[in-house]
């Protein structure tokens, strides 16, 4: 249970190390994360921190949410995200506290969650990397079909989870153990090594890695 940040995917670029190696990175804008509520065991049954990100016009905020934000003294945001954390860490925060990229450090591993780019209705070749049928030699109008999807009268049904055509993309995806290559504290940017789910401008959630990989030979 760790505090994270809400961000916006700016795009991809590359940076160079002192040795001249090129590293592909994704730029994440994590500016203006502010605490809107501290949840405790006594009041809510668990400990968590609610964070707002971005800005939203007052006319686009519902009255219950406007009252909630006014109580916290925080401007309305595009997203409200909740992070469950330890009670000791929650005690260090208060409503209106701005959380920035200094929450992380260069070289730290993080998990990034976002919504993947939607691909629409896709066939099994694009969706699951199925092989095509033969181009000729007896193949008539069955070049890109998935083939049989079931069996005979017994069991007489299609098993759940059968890979078939359908909607592709637009799923919540979490990429684990991405390394923070660089931090721009002035512009509140995180440069994360590798690719991050979603299109440019998409919202992402950055948290410390849950499953850290062991390094071979480390004592």
Curated annotation (Swiss-Prot):
One of its GO terms (biological process) is translation. One of its GO terms (cellular component) is cytosolic large ribosomal subunit. Residues 134-153 are annotated as: Disordered. Keywords: Methylation, Ribonucleoprotein, Ribosomal protein, RNA-binding, rRNA-binding. The modification N5-methylglutamine is found at residue 153. One of its GO terms (molecular function) is rRNA binding. The keyword S-adenosyl-L-methionine does not apply. Disulfide bonds: none annotated. Methylated by PrmB. Gene3D superfamilies: 3.30.160.810, Translation factors. HAMAP family: Ribosomal_uL3_B. Part of the 50S ribosomal subunit. Forms a cluster with proteins L14 and L19. Belongs to the universal ribosomal protein uL3 family. One of the primary rRNA binding proteins, it binds directly near the 3'-end of the 23S rRNA, where it nucleates assembly of the 50S subunit. NCBIfam families: L3_bact. This is Large ribosomal subunit protein uL3. The gene is rplC.
């Amino acid at each position: 249970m760790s505090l994270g940040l809400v961000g916006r995917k700016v795009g991809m670029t590359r940076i160079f190390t002192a040795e001249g190696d090129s590293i592909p990175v994704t730029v994440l804008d994590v500016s203006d994360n502010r605490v809107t509520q501290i949840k405790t065991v006594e009041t809510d049954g668990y400990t968590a921190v609610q964070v707002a990100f971005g800005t939203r016009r007052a006319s686009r905020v519902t009255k219950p949410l406007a009252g909630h934000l006014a109580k916290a003294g925080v401007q309305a945001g595009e997203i409200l995200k909740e992070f469950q954390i330890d009670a000791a860490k929650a005690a260090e925060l208060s409503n209106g506290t701005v959380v920035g990229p200094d929450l992380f450090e260069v070289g730290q591993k993080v998990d990034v969650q976002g919504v993947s780019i939607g691909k629409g209705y896709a066939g099994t070749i694009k969706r699951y990397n199925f092989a095509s049928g033969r181009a000729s030699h007896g193949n008539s109008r069955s070049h890109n079909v998935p083939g049989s999807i079931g069996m005979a009268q017994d069991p007489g049904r299609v098993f759940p989870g059968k890979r078939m055509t359908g909607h592709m993309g637009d799923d919540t995806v979490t990429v684990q153990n991405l390394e923070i290559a660089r931090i721009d504290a002035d512009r509140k940017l995180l440069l994360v090594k590798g690719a991050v789910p979603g299109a440019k401008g998409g919202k992402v959630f950055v948290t410390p890695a849950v499953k850290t990989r062991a390094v071979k030979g480390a004592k």
